Design a protein with these regions (language model features):
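Phosphate-end processing signature that detects enzymes handling 5′-triphosphorylated RNA
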Residues: 1-173
Length: 173
């Protein structure tokens, strides 16, 4: 989710993040992390004009589902303008009619793990059993962070379009 920006500030809400391909994490380790949260996400991409990416999400945590609409516009490999709003279930279902037919819905389990002043978001996909994607949101592109030793990075994939969820949605069967 994007960094909050006051509507009175005149600034656009920015999402600044780095992304890593990691070895599939130990599920027991994920569950045991203090403050860890497990979220089931179904992400559907909507038709757009090409200047931005539009999607809707079903976000289920602890038996409660919320629906979120997101519009993203790329500024750099690490930074995007991201505008989100919560939807009613009826509005979510109506927007599904605008789904991009060239992309499949992406289902994933997201683990949110507090780590110092950051939150690690680890996405587990049903089509991968040996790797996962880790994202960390930052306050600036220069912001530094440390990953726990239990996280084994294969490589950084920030800016690699193959690891965008919107790209994965095109590759799914």
């Amino acid at each position: 989710m994007s960094n909050p920006v006051s509507p009175l500030s005149g600034q656009e809400p920015l999402e600044i993040e780095r992304k890593f391909l990691i070895e599939y994490p130990d599920p027991v380790w994920l569950e045991r992390q203090p403050g860890s949260r497990r979220v089931e996400i179904i992400q559907t991409y909507l038709l757009s004009d090409g200047s931005s990416t539009r999607r809707v999400r079903s976000w289920t945590e602890a038996g409660r589902t919320v629906y979120i609409r997101t519009c993203k516009r790329r500024l750099s490999d690490r930074t995007r303008v991201e505008v989100e709003d919560e939807l009613s279930e009826a509005d979510y279902l109506a927007l599904l009619k605008e789904a991009d037919p060239t992309r499949h819905p992406v289902e994933k389990t997201r683990w949110c793990i507090p780590c110092g002043s950051h939150v690690l978001e680890i996405d587990l996909y049903p089509f991968w059993s040996d790797q996962a994607v880790l994202e960390v949101e930052l306050q600036s592109e220069e912001d530094e962070f440390l990953l726990p030793p239990e996280i084994r990075v294969i490589r950084e994939v920030t800016g690699d379009p193959r690891y965008l969820n919107s790209s994965l949605a095109r590759e799914l069967p």
